[in-house]
């Protein structure tokens, strides 16, 4: 299992990039080895989300409430669906029908540990920008950035007009997305950890 990496975007937030076909969710406490940890009233191992083809399936470890109905069997997640793990409410969204990438957001007062804006369940691509179909909304950006998978590696495609520098050097072509890289442009500033 690959632990999610965190994408920090200046002025926007921090996002867990979940690249595995199976993501575990549970309570945040020392020694708990879930992929996505939540500070809240939730069991240590509450659920698993599996990628099945282009879809995501919620596999409850404890009973969950999906749209208000108690479920203890696998549930196919749909755009906009809300589910509760203990007293923690989560919303699943798929902003673009052209991508299997989805977004998990906590509703209410609970928080991810480490502190995140959202968790991104990666498919083959992830779009960052101001548009409503972007997986990561960056309201002040006039350009879109595309993260895409090629083989087992992730790449970043940034428009030429964005004047982007990678570790201080101007970039014109898609580049591998690597931990520790600082990507900066006129509106864009982000780093993967």
Over which residues does each language-model region extend?
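Hydrophobic, helix-prone linear segments
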Residues: 1-22
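Short polybasic amphipathic segments
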Residues: 3-8, 63-66, 102-107, 162-166
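A generic structural motif
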Residues: 7-9, 50, 107-112, 149
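Glycine-centered tight beta-turn/hairpin loop motif at sheet-sheet or coil-to-beta transitions
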Residues: 10-12, 31, 85-87, 185-187
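Forkhead-associated
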Residues: 17-79, 118-187
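Surface-exposed beta-loop interaction hotspot
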Residues: 69, 73-131
